[in-house]
Structure formats: C-alpha cells, structure tokens
Amino acid sequence: MTNIGGGSFGTKKIRTERSILPEICIFLGIRITMHYSEHNPPHFHARYGDFSAVVSILDSSILSGFLPNKQLKIVLAWAQINQDELMQNWELMKNRKEPNTIKPIS
C-alpha cells in the first residue's frame, strides 16, 4: 500500500491493487478503511499488521477475516462507540464523496 495524498477532510487515501481506500482512523497500530462503491451490508475494513477483517457497521460482527483477540475487542468497541459516524461515512462513500475521519479510541 502506498500513501497517495490527503483528502479534503484529512483522510489519507491508500492505493491497493484493486481500489483506493480512504483511511478513516488509525489507533494502536490498527488501520480502519472503507472502499468506494462497496457492497452491502455496510461495513469497514480493519488491518493490523498481516491480519485484516471486514466488520459490519450495523451489528459489529466479523463478516470475514481475522484479527488477534486483543485488537478485535478494541475494534469492536470502537465500532460500537462510532456506529453513527461509520454509517454517515458509508452513505458518503456510496455517493463517492470523501469520508470524514473518526476519532481513535481513547
């Protein structure tokens, strides 16, 4: 992945082989991203080192992938706290608009 510049809301865009992923948040070595024009259900991607998971925004369940238990608990807690902001970003991205950054867990 390569940083290709900042967005108007302070998000970074990460280029992968398939798409550009706006970075929503980074905390404790965990990178949270979303894809433009993504399929339902509403979800985000969490990456920690070599591990990655797709997490449902609606119920904070793991749709696919794996994170170590400690990081998984942190990501799920963060997702529950920020569910409204995540859904707002999902709607923005469905309309191909730049998402907002979300505060890291403290």
Region spans (language model):
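A cross-family signal for N-terminal binding/gating loops and helix N-caps
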Residues: 1-30, 36, 49-51, 62
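Short, functionally important structural connectors and interaction interfaces within domains
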Residues: 19, 47-49, 54, 59, ...
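Intrinsically disordered, low-complexity boundary segments flanking structured domains
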Residues: 19-22, 42-44, 88-89
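Residue-level preference for alpha-helix termini and adjacent loops
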Residues: 23-26, 54, 61-62, 66, ...
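A short, structured beta-strand/loop element
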Residues: 35-69
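C-terminal structural segments of small proteins and small subunits
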Residues: 74-106
